[in-house]
Amino acid sequence: MPNILNKILEQIVFWMAWIIIPLIMEIIPAFGGFVILLKKKLFGKKEEKPIKLPEITLIIPVYNSADTLEACLASVHDSTYPTEQINILLVNNQSKDDSFKVYCHCQELYPDLKMQWLSAKQGKSKALNMALFCSDGKYIIHIDSDGVLEKNALENMVIRFENDPDVHCMTGAVLTSKEMIEDTESFRGRIVRRCEFLEYCQAFLAGRNFQSELDSIYTLSGAFSAFRKSVILKTQLYNTDTVCEDTHVTFQIRKLMKKSVHLCENALFFVDPIESGEKLYTQ
């Protein structure tokens, strides 16, 4: 009889752990993030747009990005941020495809965009460090070459910086493309991609939003992040000996420089949805 009771107790503890841990780690922060978003929407202070938006540098690491680079640059060109105030540094990370040809084509398509092609040694952190030293302007923004900016993303992020001098570093909200999700032919594939979209929403619009309110963001999104130039250049920059360079630079800003890191929830960056359920599981 005691053995049976022990087994029943073990099963109760086991299943309670599977229920309680997700409740604490996922559901409560998600609900908190929703409340925070609602509060900002209804009662948030309206951010004032400066008379003239400052000059910024947009750093885009490029590695075999021939298929996605044109769409990425088109989203920058079509954004609401003044093109004359944007400096774009495309840092080639030893690509082996036609990325450079796409860059040359985009120079012809968008002659009003100031674009520069740099070549760096292998490794994303080395590419980012190289571009940081070549940057101009008040703010430095990183985006990946395999996604596209929502048209107001750059403007919203810079306005947040300009309205709050205590914000020194921000991460944008990364979501999967809803258009590509709805264009998915198979029903199963569409369901998988919608689940992935909800996962991204939970991670950024709920989880990161909750962390931002508590000032507890310790990892920037490598796909879309921004810094005050005066702050990032005082760090040890990106560590070339680790694959967690985004976390490393975030810790430098938070712990060594005692600066704050926030989420800009209305600065959106869209990436391609997952190709299959198997890849979603791996991710």
Language-model features, listed with the residues they occupy:
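Short aromatic/hydrophobic "clamp" motif used to bind/position activated sugar donors
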Residues: 140
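A conserved acidic beta->alpha catalytic loop
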Residues: 92-101, 120-122
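Cell-envelope/extracellular polymer assembly enzymes that use nucleotide-activated donors
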Residues: 54-57, 87, 248
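Long helical/loop segments within the catalytic core of UDP-sugar-dependent glycosyltransferases
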Residues: 110, 126-127, 151-236, 240
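N-terminal membrane-anchoring/stem segments of glycan-assembly enzymes
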Residues: 1-52, 208
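Glycine-rich, basic loop-to-helix element that forms the pyrophosphate-binding segment
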Residues: 118-135, 156
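Catalytic donor-sugar/metal-binding loop of nucleotide-sugar-dependent glycosyltransferases
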Residues: 241, 251-270
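Short, acidic, metal-binding catalytic loop of nucleotide-sugar glycosyltransferases
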Residues: 74-85
